């Protein structure tokens, strides 16, 4: 193992742990009286602010902002606005679904992406997408089958978590298409437009700003404007944890790790996120999964690995990862 790989792998693990922290912190935040809309409003507002500070303190990133093509800017704004559906459904689901179970179910998204790619994007060869889908469905069935009926979360919450996975999968397909990937380019060199545009930190800051703006408008529309006075004092440290650890730290460590080991390997290593959520949920929230649910989680992870390790045709993009979005 070379030095870059040795440094990159721990960074991706730290990133996965950071993202997992956001799921686990949601429950104690909700316990203070803060609901999902308020949580995501502040998460993306403060996250976008930190993102712009990170851009502006670096002359290289400032230069990338100035050079950012207009099309890339519009794409980032559009994707940021669309991302509200994924984040909103997931955190709304976490109001009633335990973080451990939600973390397992939502991680079916790489498999959904692989299947959707058969029709809407650069398809993966062979039967792997269908094998992965079968494993993911079986894993989800086991995860749900092990739920204690006496303490089962409402079906609405489970549907919200699944909706989050589906919306994020569609979002990834759209992001690839808007960035220039063409389904009819299969087997040929990737078009120039599909290459990374601008600095990743700049793109993320723009996207998070768009997401924050949509949530701010949504809050005004339902009579819930951003008002710090409405946040209980005990919720602020937890909100800070979501912003600093689950957003800023997770994003930056993923970028740093992916630059060292590549997005494909980073995507594979990121599959440690659901197990981390399960462990953190047990340690800090006392949440546990039944043995049959753990078996289901294992099947889902195997499905993700099958989808992520499928050989890609020449010119096909690397597997979708959190590099393309703030999650």
Spans of features found by a protein language model:
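Hydrophobic/aromatic residues within transmembrane alpha-helices
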Residues: 29, 39, 43, 93, ...
